[in-house]
From Swiss-Prot:
Keywords: Allosteric enzyme, Glycosyltransferase, GTP-binding, Magnesium, Nucleotide-binding, Transferase. Its EC number is 2.4.2.9. SUPFAM superfamilies: PRTase-like. Catalyzes the conversion of uracil and 5-phospho-alpha-D-ribose 1-diphosphate (PRPP) to UMP and diphosphate. InterPro entries: PRibTrfase_dom, PRTase-like, Upp_B, UPRTase/APRTase, Ura_phspho_trans. This is Uracil phosphoribosyltransferase. Uracil binds at residues 193, 198-200. CDD domains: PRTases_typeI. It holds the Pfam family UPRTase. Signal peptide: none annotated. The gene is upp.
């Protein structure tokens, strides 16, 4: 499976705090931002760099910068917005693309009700953010949309993943790497990740 579980002590600590049943909206939202920031550091580890010259205090010196078009961050509405600030804290120049999905009542498959992509998608790396990778349907649909725009370098950043969701993404898009803070046990009969986080969107937006 093309999945990278970020096993950093701070990531594990903060994720456990999010799992607490009495975690407040403020605390949950803050931790989601902090985790996204830490995890984005790992997800950006293989960014390609190039050399260029700058004027330093002692004269001209050679330095490094990220090569190519700026990353586009792609939150899946609405829960993905809860991770956006954390990624932007680390990569403030990132461009933001947005995808909104809903379930077709006949096919039960996710369909797009809103999508807004930045320009030159075929030249940019994309980082999809969503707290939960459960069945994988929304993630697969989002990757489909990105590839239809010509995007070739795609990663997914999620707080918690279920094996079922990871398998769905890997089966449909084996070239996409998933970064997660935890690979949990399974989905229950209602499609919730166990032990998971509950409804991350409701907890982030205070609508639970």
């Amino acid at each position: 499976m093309n999945v990278n579980v970020i096993n950093h002590p701070l990531v594990r600590h903060k994720l456990t705090l999010m799992r607490e049943a009495d975690c407040s909206t403020y605390k949950f939202r803050t931790l989601a931002t902090e985790l996204a920031r830490l995890m984005a550091y790992e997800a950006s580890r293989d960014f390609e760099i190039e050399k260029y010259l700058i004027d330093g205090w002692c004269g001209q010196i050679e330095g490094d910068r990220i090569k190519g078009k700026t990353l586009t961050v792609v939150p899946i509405l609405r829960a993905g917005l809860g991770m956006l600030d954390g990624v932007l804290d680390l990569i403030p120049t990132a461009k933001i693309s947005v995808v909104g999905l809903q379930r077709d009542e006949e096919t039960l498959k996710p369909i797009s009700y809103f999508e807004k992509f930045v320009d030159s998608m075929d030249e940019r790396p994309a980082l999809i953010i969503d707290p939960m990778l459960a069945t994988g349907g929304s993630m697969v649909a989002t990757i489909d949309l990105l590839k239809a725009k010509g995007c070739k370098n795609i990663k997914a950043l999620v707080l918690v993943a279920a094996p079922e969701g990871v398998k769905a993404v890997n089966d449909a898009h084996p070239d996409v790497t998933i970064y997660t803070a935890a690979l949990d046990s399974h989905l229950n009969e209602n499609g919730y990740i166990i032990p998971g986080l509950g409804d991350a969107g409701d907890k982030i937006f205070g609508t639970r």
